[in-house]
A protein has these predicted regions:
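Carboxylate-rich, polar loop motifs that coordinate divalent cations or form catalytic acidic clusters
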Residues: 1-184
Length: 184
C-alpha cells in the first residue's frame, strides 16, 4: 500500500463513520455508502472528494436510515436493507428521490434484512431473520422461502454473494450456508 486516506463524514455537527455496505458507480466515479445511525445513504464523489447524505424521505422511521446492506440494480435502483425492512430508492438528478418502503405488512418474511442480491431476471433476494424473500420489482410481488424449504432460516449481516460466472446466489446464516440458482 502506497497511499491511504481517511475521510470523516459529518452532518449537523455529528460524525457518521459507521458503514455496513458499499456500492460503486464506475461511470460517475461515485461510491455509495450505507450508513448506520439514521442517515441512510451517502453519495461520495471519488474525483472531487465531496459527499452528500441522501434523504430517505421518512423522518418518522429512524430505522429506514439504518442501512445494513445494499444492492444497486441493473436499472439503477437502490435496494437498502435495514432493521425495518427494505427501501427501494431511485435517484433522479436535481429531483427528490423516489422512495418506497416495504416491511412484513407488504409481504417480506421478516423486517430484519441482512443481505440483498439481484438475480439475472432483475428480481431481488433478501436474507432475513426468518428466511429468504424474493421480490419481483415489476409486479411488486414477494415470495417467501422458509423451513422446511431451507436448512438455514436465520441469516447473518454481510454474508451474501453472487457468483459472476454462474449467477448463483449465496447466503450465510447462523447454522450454515445456502445457495440459490434462480434459473432452476
Amino acid at each position: 500500500i502506497k497511499y491511504v486516506k481517511s475521510f470523516i463524514l459529518e452532518k449537523d455537527g455529528k460524525i457518521y463513520n459507521e458503514f455496513h455496505s458499499m456500492s460503486y458507480d464506475d461511470e460517475a466515479s461515485l461510491l455509495y455508502l450505507g450508513s448506520r445511525g439514521g442517515y441512510g445513504l451517502v453519495r461520495f464523489n471519488l474525483l472531487t472528494k465531496k459527499y452528500e447524505f441522501i434523504p430517505m424521505n421518512n423522518a418518522g422511521n429512524r430505522a429506514v436510515g439504518d442501512v445494513l446492506c445494499m444492492c444497486y440494480s441493473k436499472d439503477s435502483t437502490f435496494y437498502l436493507g435495514a432493521s425495518s425492512g427494505m427501501t427501494q430508492m431511485k435517484l433522479h438528478s436535481g429531483n427528490p428521490a423516489e422512495v418506497r418502503q416495504y416491511s412484513r405488512i407488504d409481504g417480506i418474511k421478516n423486517d430484519m434484512v441482512h443481505g440483498i442480491l439481484e438475480d439475472s431476471d432483475g428480481c431481488v433476494w433478501l436474507s432475513t431473520n426468518k428466511g429468504l424473500t424474493k421480490y419481483n420489482p415489476h409486479n411488486r410481488f414477494f415470495h417467501n422461502y422458509e423451513s422446511p424449504d431451507l436448512d438455514v432460516t436465520e441469516f447473518s449481516d454481510d454474508a451474501y454473494w453472487k457468483c459472476p460466472y454462474t449467477g448463483k446466489l449465496f447466503f450465510g446464516g447462523i447454522n450454515g450456508v445456502i445457495w440459490v440458482d434462480p434459473q432452476n
